[in-house]
Amino acid sequence: MKILKGTASARGMRVAIVGACFNGPIADALVSGAQQTFLDLGGSEDMLTVVRVPGSFEIPCTLKKLLSSGMEYHAIVACGVLIKGETSHYDLIADQVAARVSELSVEYGLPITFSVITAPSVDSAWQRAGIKGSHLGVSGMETALEMANLFEKL
């Protein structure tokens, strides 16, 4: 029996981060965490592309542009922050962004991790950005690299 598993190593991996700017400090923490994790896991700065977009809604079209640009990426991390407000805007954006990111990952056969925080409050969002617990930018990069290394074996 053959069991295949990826490792969270960035050595030799070309990776992109598409990070939304909306909800600034939290979004910046996600992108910074993903960047630092890439470097900590053996990646080099010249193999990392960071693209900042205005908001999470702009992530899917930017992913599509990157994927069709001719540049070969091993994985992409999509970072953003959506905080629930009093209107249905949050639900519409969260559902559409998640669906499109997933569709692009399947369509292109490329690991694209969904490191978009969807939270009921600012405090809850900060908890997912490493202040009091998990860090979605870090875990998103680790997962992206693990999947990229697994895909190299398939």
Swiss-Prot record:
Organism domain of life: Bacteria
Reactions that this protein is recorded to catalyse: (2S)-2-hydroxy-3-oxobutyl phosphate + 5-amino-6-(D-ribitylamino)uracil = 6,7-dimethyl-8-(1-D-ribityl)lumazine + phosphate + 2 H2O + H(+)
CDD domains: Lumazine_synthase-I
One annotated GO biological process: riboflavin biosynthetic process
Keyword hit for Transferase: yes
UniProtKB keywords: Riboflavin biosynthesis, Transferase
Annotated (2S)-2-hydroxy-3-oxobutyl phosphate binding sites: E86, T87, R128
Class of enzymatic activity (EC top level): transferase
Keyword check for Repeat: no
Active site: H89
InterPro entries named in the record: LS, LS/RS, LS/RS_sf
A family per Pfam: DMRL_synthase
Pathway: Cofactor biosynthesis; riboflavin biosynthesis; riboflavin from 2-hydroxy-3-oxobutyl phosphate and 5-amino-6-(D-ribitylamino)uracil: step 1/2
Residues reported to bind 5-amino-6-(D-ribitylamino)uracil: F22, S56, F57, E58, V81, L82, I83, F114
Function in brief: Catalyzes the formation of 6,7-dimethyl-8-ribityllumazine by condensation of 5-amino-6-(D-ribitylamino)uracil with 3,4-dihydroxy-2-butanone 4-phosphate. This is the penultimate step in the biosynthesis of riboflavin.
Family stated for the protein in its record: Belongs to the DMRL synthase family.
Protein name: 6,7-dimethyl-8-ribityllumazine synthase
Organism: Chlamydia felis (strain Fe/C-56) (Chlamydophila felis)
